[in-house]
Amino acid sequence: MKQLRMLAIDTSTEACSAALLWSDGEVHQRFVVTERGHADLILPMIDELLAEAGCKLKDLDGLAFGRGPGGFTGLRIAAGVIQGRAYGAGLRVAPVSSLAAVAFLAPSPPSAPSSGVLVCNDARMNEVYWGCYRFDPGAPCVPIVLAAEAVGPEQEA
C-alpha cells in the first residue's frame, strides 16, 4: 500500500506548526510557540519542509489544516494558506479538529468502549476549549456528546 504524502499546518493556538509526511514514512516538522506572527512564520515553514524532503507541493497527495477550535485570526490564516496552496497545486484539503488530533495522540487509547480522552486547550479569559473523544479499534477518534449536567453545574459569575 502506498504511503500517503501529506502536509499539515496548525495556527489555531500560540503554537505555529507544520508537518510533512513523505513517502519514506518520515515526518518532517517545524514548531514555534509565539503569541503573534503566525502568518509570517507558516509559509517559510512549509517551504523549508518541502526543501528538506526534496519534493514539491504538487508531489503530495493532499493538505490538512487545524480547523480549531482556536483564535479566529489563526484559523483564517491556516485555512487561507492551505486553500491557496491546494488550489494552485490541484490538491485536496482536509480540515482536522485540533482537539481530536491531540486526543488521537493520547499515550494509550482506552480499551473499554465507554471510556475516552478529554482534551482541553486554553481559550483565554478563564475559559477552555474542550472535547471528549472515544476510541474504537480500527475506527477514527470519535467525539462524545455529553449533556450539560455531565460537565458540571452552572456557576454564577
Predicted regions, residues:
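Phosphate-handling active-site elements
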Residues: 52-58, 86-96, 111-112
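DPxDG-like acidic metal-binding loop motif
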Residues: 64-98
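N-terminal beta-alpha supersecondary unit
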Residues: 1-67
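A glycine- and small-aliphatic-rich helix-loop capping segment at beta-alpha/alpha-beta transitions
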Residues: 23-26, 80-89, 135-138
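Short amphipathic alpha-helical face segments that pack within enzyme cores
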Residues: 41-44, 80, 101
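Short glycine-rich anion-binding loops that position phosphate/pyrophosphate groups of nucleotides
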Residues: 14, 68-69, 123-126
